[in-house]
């Protein structure tokens, strides 16, 4: 019995350590077990004009526009153009025609009206911008003041809203930057018309970048997730880059491609520049200020003859990490919702959760039904585990007698215990395998509920108005503690007094920790525990009836 209990404790602590290690890596800290790929992989030769070092994009303008409230003369020349659509409230800074503020007013179904999220912002305390410009000469870029096209509407009344900004002539080029917002969409079409008004041909390079500081996003305690840049290409797939690796110049990513996208990722939300498929581009990631970072692409353009105008089009995604929506926008974009090493299990679980929600219309009840379905699927394994535990509980008095009898001779005690197991046809490890098989599923569901923006603002019943926030009255954590206490009473009492005290202390320790977990996660664990208690009680009772009948 001690061997089995020790194995189960080892499994439990290994699972806890693996969860914590995954949390560490997602929160930008090094793994406890595996060195970062950037520490072991030798960087491939850089493509022309690109490198994996932090000093890579030296030809990019380093200036960041002054935050609102600055009194510098340059800042006074610019203005903020406010706009609104059905999903956004925002501002475009005429300095660079930069999207400097973007508030999501409809971040998903079932959200409360006051639960808006400001994604892009530019204040004294926080910077997060989407900007573009031209390289290769003294051409218009994000440091120049653009002029809004006169007479354009700034509030969406139809299915689209178009805002255009014109640059001054610079280096023989004029630029007209146009943002097109579509009703119900989190994808912004950004079209740049480049006109050569000079007398000589020019060959500029366009850049598109996301700039933000390392300020953490507010999330429930114990629920921190990855914040930082990400790069996706068909050749190298999804690559996350932590701010810490960028600080140490150890970032590892694809530096050139003709596909993919670059993004800034945070809990529940992301932004991404998606250039035209097939357009060659160099990718860069760098630190530009003590706490300011950028990720972007540089796209070489064709030679523009005098009098010629060319178009450069790209899409800018800025919105919630809703898997189905992301899959329809660009290949691989759904990976910004990162499940880590459990993706292969987590994605089908979310698909199933989403299907259940489609029928019941409530994410809380969807969690309950999914947990019930998982327990039903694993019932044969759980039954085997509970039967083994019940048999072990029956022979516990005899085991304790053998331990007392041979306590001075461990070898004889182990031999006697093994003989008892053989005689009673009990496998001390019989309950371990079913538990091990189920652990990856439970961990995967943990990450599904933690990562899904659909939980944000989603109510369940009565006092639970937001499954992504902690229970305001701690009712679910208390119920979880009670359910864990009941489970300890159903299990065999450990012969070791220290183990017995630990088993009694666990419900208290876990309930305190779960006070700060999102309500959706705690709901899952409560339902899982209640179903486990019901299964164990049923199986134990059936075994008792069979024994009496025999």
UniProtKB/Swiss-Prot annotation:
Record InterPro entries: Membr_insert_YidC, Membr_insert_YidC_N, YidC/ALB3/OXA1/COX18, YidC/Oxa/ALB_C, YidC_ALB_C, YidC_periplasmic_sf
Origin: domain of life: Bacteria
Compartments (UniProt record): Cell inner membrane
Transmembrane region(s): 3-23, 363-383, 429-449, 472-492, 503-523
CDD domains cross-referenced by the UniProt entry: 5TM_YidC_Alb3, EcYidC-like_peri
Compositionally biased residues, Low complexity: 35-73
Gene Ontology CC, one term: plasma membrane
Biological processes per GO annotation: protein insertion into membrane; protein transport
Keyword Protein transport in record: yes
Signal sequence residues: none
Keyword Transport belongs to the record: yes
Alphabetically ordered keywords of this record: Cell inner membrane, Cell membrane, Chaperone, Membrane, Protein transport, Transmembrane, Transmembrane helix, Transport
GO molecular function, one term: membrane insertase activity
Bilayer topology annotation: Multi-pass membrane protein
Main subcellular localisation: membrane
Region (Disordered): 34-73
Binding partners and assembly: Interacts with the Sec translocase complex via SecD. Specifically interacts with transmembrane segments of nascent integral membrane proteins during membrane integration.
Entry's family note: Belongs to the OXA1/ALB3/YidC family. Type 1 subfamily.
NCBIfam families per record: PRK01318.1-3, PRK01318.1-4, yidC_nterm, yidC_oxa1_cterm
Identification of the protein by name: Membrane protein insertase YidC
Native species: Paraburkholderia phymatum (strain DSM 17167 / CIP 108236 / LMG 21445 / STM815)
Gene: yidC
């Amino acid at each position: 019995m001690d061997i089995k209990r020790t194995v189960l404790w080892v499994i439990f602590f290994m699972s806890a350590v693996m969860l914590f290690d995954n949390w560490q890596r997602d929160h930008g800290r090094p793994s406890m077990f595996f060195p970062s790929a950037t520490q072991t992989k030798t960087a491939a030769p850089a493509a022309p004009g690109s490198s994996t070092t932090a000093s890579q994009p030296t030809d990019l303008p380093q200036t960041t526009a002054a935050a609102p409230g600055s009194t510098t003369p340059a800042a006074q020349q610019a203005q903020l153009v406010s706009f609104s659509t059905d999903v956004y409230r925002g501002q475009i800074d005429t300095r660079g025609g930069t999207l400097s503020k973007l508030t999501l007013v409809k971040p998903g179904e079932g959200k409360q009206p006051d639960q808006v999220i400001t994604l892009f912002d530019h204040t004294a305390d926080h910077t997060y911008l989407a900007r573009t410009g031209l390289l290769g000469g003294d051409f218009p870029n994000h440091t120049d003041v653009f002029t809004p096209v006169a007479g354009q509407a700034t509030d969406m009344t139809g299915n689209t809203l178009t805002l255009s900004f014109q640059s001054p002539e610079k280096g023989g080029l004029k630029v007209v930057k146009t943002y097109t917002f579509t009703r119900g969409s989190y994808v912004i079409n950004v079209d740049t018309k480049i006109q050569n008004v000079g007398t000589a041909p020019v060959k500029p390079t366009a850049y598109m970048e996301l700039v933000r500081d390392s300020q953490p996003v507010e999330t429930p305690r114990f629920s921190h997730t990855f914040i930082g840049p990400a790069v996706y290409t068909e050749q190298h797939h999804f690559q996350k880059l932590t701010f810490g690796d960028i600080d140490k110049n150890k970032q590892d990513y694809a530096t050139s491609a003709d596909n993919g996208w670059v993004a800034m990722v945070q809990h529940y939300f992301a932004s991404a520049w998606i250039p035209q498929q097939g357009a060659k581009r160099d990718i860069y990631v760098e630190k530009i200020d003590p706490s300011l970072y950028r990720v972007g692409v540089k796209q070489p353009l064709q030679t523009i003859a005098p009098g010629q105008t060319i178009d450069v089009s790209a899409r800018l995604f800025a919105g919630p990490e809703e898997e189905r929506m992301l899959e329809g926008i660009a290949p691989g974009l759904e990976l910004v919702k990162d499940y880590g090493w459990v993706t292969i299990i987590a994605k089908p679980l979310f698909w199933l959760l989403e299907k259940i929600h489609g029928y019941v219309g409530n994410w809380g009840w969807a969690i309950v039904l999914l947990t019930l379905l998982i327990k039903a699927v694993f019932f044969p394994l759980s039954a085997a585990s509970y039967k083994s535990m019940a048999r072990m509980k029956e022979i516990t008095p005899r085991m304790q007698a053998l331990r007392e009898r041979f306590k001075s001779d461990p070898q004889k005690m182990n031999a006697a215990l093994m003989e008892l197991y053989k005689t009673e046809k009990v496998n001390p490890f019989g309950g371990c395998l079913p538990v091990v098989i189920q652990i990856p599923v439970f961990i995967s569901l943990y990450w599904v509920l933690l990562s899904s923006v659909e939980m944000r603002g989603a109510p369940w019943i009565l006092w639970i108005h937001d499954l992504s926030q902690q229970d305001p009255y701690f009712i679910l954590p208390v119920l979880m503690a009670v359910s864990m206490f009941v489970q300890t009473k159903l299990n065999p009492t450990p012969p070791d007094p220290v183990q017995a005290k630990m088993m009694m202390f666990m419900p208290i320790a876990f309930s305190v920790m779960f006070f700060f977990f999102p309500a959706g996660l705690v709901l899952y664990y409560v339902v899982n525990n209640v179903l486990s208690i019901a299964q164990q009680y049923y199986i134990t009772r059936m075994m008792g009836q069979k024994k009496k009948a025999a």
